[in-house]
Amino acid sequence: MIDLLQIELIKRLKYKYMRAVDTNNWVELAACLTEDAVSNYDSGKYSFEGRDNIIDFLKQFMDRPTQVTQHHAHHPEIDITSDTTAKGIWCLQDIVIDLDANITLRGTGIYHDEYEKVDGEWKIKLTGYVRIYEEIEERSDKVKLVTNMFAKE
């Protein structure tokens, strides 16, 4: 029998992970990962072992007021493999606006995740995506970023 409650809890975990990435909430993001988590972002181009190493990379890569991101994970295919483990496949859509480089990046990919229940709570043990496509466009003078939650006033 499919355990829909556990699947919904895993969906909430992935949604929280994406929100934490986009809001640069590194404490909340760390809480989504097991201590020994592994990441393989962008077809393995950015691979890290250990929660702290993953968070350090993302902070270095993303935590600046001149960059904003939007990551959406949807169409989940989640399989509960035991009482404490699960696997998931997700579609990814992302947008990155980088004002320093004057570009907008848009892309899609497929996430492959593994989950582990730790002290009764689902955590991400392995996460990573393979790109379907990525396009980069130079930002025109006609396009203005008018709201940015990270900009210093």
Language-model features: locations:
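Short, well-structured alpha-helical interface segments that form or flank functional binding sites
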Residues: 12, 49, 110
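A beta-strand edge to alpha-helix "cap/lid" segment located at domain peripheries
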Residues: 63-153
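Short, low-complexity N-terminal intrinsically disordered segments enriched in polar/charged residues
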Residues: 1-31, 35
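A structural signal for alpha-helical segments
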Residues: 5, 46-49, 103
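A solvent-exposed, acidic/Ser-Thr-rich amphipathic alpha-helical stretch
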Residues: 27, 31-92
